[in-house]
Amino acid sequence: MALYVQKYGGTSVGTTDRIEHVADKVKSFCDNGHDVVVVVSAMSGETNRLLSLASAITDQPNPREMDVLVSTGEQVTIALLCMALQKRGCSARSYTGDQVRIVTDSAHTKARIKHIDVEAIQNDLKTGRVVVVAGFQGVDELGNTTTLGRGGSDTTAVALAAALKADECQIYTDVDGVYTTDPRVVDSARRLDKITFEEMLEMASQGSKVLQIRSVEFAGKYNVPLRVLSSFVDGPGTLITLEEEQPMEQPVISGIAFNRDEAKLTVLGVPDIPGVASRILGPVSAANIEVDMIVQNVADDNSTDFTFTVHRNDFERVKKVLNEVGNDLGAREVRGDANIAKVSIVGVGMRSHAGVASKMFDTLAAENINIQMISTSEIKVAVVIAERYLELAVRALHSAFELDAREQNR
């Protein structure tokens, strides 16, 4: 039979009743003859509780000690789930990231997986045992506990699935799959039966929060079939896999992603000379701030306006950096706007269809929505607009590309 790696997030294991429900679900797979490795997150709210304890002690906690602290959340969950499985007659054993030898680099709070020793897991599976692994954590070459960053349990699950050559990695969440857009914004949004790694990666990077970006990258790199399912409602979910032969009537657009957590900054009137972009963005990068979209407008007077977006949480820090940079460059002004949003259309069908961007722009214009910035890739068009128009834009685009009227055939 098949080998499944299943991941259950914090909401799915948020109470002991929900842990019991997960145990029932896992047991049903075992009863059907499948091998199961389960990866779990900390119970909902537990990681935040642990972080608040650290904050009560110091506002500058040591990263190594933070990893030791927050990794305890998953340790509670793996033990409770094993107890629930054993109560149901299932042989089960729990492993921390250290015990299962998920070896990472030493970048505390944001470590990356280097390799996994799966021998112990394989030996357990041969005896019919369910293996329950703590997500989000690992150990470096020196024996220090490390964590993979927020959402790292998804990455743990995919990495284990790749190392074990599992038939499928199943991510159980509080939604029943990947939708054409957020159903809370468009109530006629539809669940997709299938989506490519490439599309899912674009949607995740553009604001869709169903899957963590690193896990999608990992799955695509090692060709691990991913399936997003609900912990609470039975259904087929959404399969994320390599691009294969598509139906003749393949949709141009698979989904609409959006992100409210953006802020825009502009340095006005800097000299249009070689290296100016580096002089602006270098200090931003040195402050460990990620830049998203970039636009440079050159004027006739040999000056340029340089605009880019960052995460809204970094807005004030970036303004401070840019004010210093602007003074050094002789900039006319530094402007900022935290009341923006990004809306993106995503679909591999763009490769073979012309006029997709034009249709997007026409749709927004018809709603009197001004486009402030544009970014494109082979399968994505993203725009920045005023945040107050976000939901109107998403609904209009969802309708224009017939995502809420089409029978799903993917």
Q: How would you label these PLM feature ranges?
A:
Residues 43, 175-177, 222-226, 230-235, ...:
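Glycine-rich beta-alpha junction loops
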Residues 91-93, 225, 290, 370:
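Conserved beta-strand segments of alpha/beta enzyme cores
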Residues 57, 237-410:
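A conserved regulatory-domain signal marking ACT and ACT-like small-molecule sensing domains
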Residues 168-172, 226-228, 292, 373:
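Short hydrophobic alpha-helical runs that function as membrane-insertion/retention elements
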Residues 219:
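Acidic-aromatic/histidine active-site loop/patch
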Residues 32, 88, 222, 287, ...:
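Conserved dinucleotide-binding and phosphotransfer motif residues
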Residues 1-216, 309, 384-386, 401, ...:
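Nucleotide/pyrophosphate-binding catalytic subdomain
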